[in-house]
């Protein structure tokens, strides 16, 4: 299982604040629903936990998604981010 926090894909955050992908492929303020759409289009099984808080922002309930994948985490995050760019256009 790979944990995907919306912060990993957020263009507005720095690497120190939690972004894991490059700014070129990151998206502005990704929502859980958008990430779910991207995962459906990628045909990846997942489960959503909406009441979870990102450790760096424990006061915000941003939620997280657990994805079943054998791919390395960064490769998966890049795929999700690119799919999010398609969805948001």
From Swiss-Prot:
One of its GO terms (cellular component) is signal recognition particle. It comes from Methanobrevibacter smithii (strain ATCC 35061 / DSM 861 / OCM 144 / PS). Keywords: Cytoplasm, Ribonucleoprotein, RNA-binding, Signal recognition particle. Belongs to the SRP19 family. The keyword Oxidoreductase does not apply. Transmembrane segments: none annotated. GO terms for biological process: SRP-dependent cotranslational protein targeting to membrane, signal sequence recognition. Pfam families: SRP19 (PF01922). Part of the signal recognition particle protein translocation system, which is composed of SRP and FtsY. Archaeal SRP consists of a 7S RNA molecule of 300 nucleotides and two protein subunits: SRP54 and SRP19. InterPro entries: Signal_recog_particle_SRP19, SRP19-like_sf, SRP19_arc-type. Involved in targeting and insertion of nascent membrane proteins into the cytoplasmic membrane. Binds directly to 7S RNA and mediates binding of the 54 kDa subunit of the SRP. It is found in: Cytoplasm. GO terms for molecular function: 7S RNA binding. The lineage of its organism: Archaea, Methanobacteriati, Methanobacteriota, Methanomada group, Methanobacteria. The keyword RNA-binding applies. This is Signal recognition particle 19 kDa protein. It comes from the Archaea.
């Amino acid at each position: 299982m790979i944990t995907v926090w919306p912060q990993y894909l957020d263009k507005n955050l720095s690497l120190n604040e939690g972004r894991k992908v490059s700014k070129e492929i990151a998206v502005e303020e990704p929502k859980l629903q958008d990430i779910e759409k991207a995962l459906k289009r990628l045909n990846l099984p997942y489960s959503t936990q909406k009441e979870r808080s990102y450790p760096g922002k424990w006061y915000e309930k941003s939620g997280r998604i657990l994805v079943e994948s054998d791919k390395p985490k960064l490769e998966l995050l890049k795929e999700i981010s690119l799919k999010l760019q398609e969805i948001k256009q």
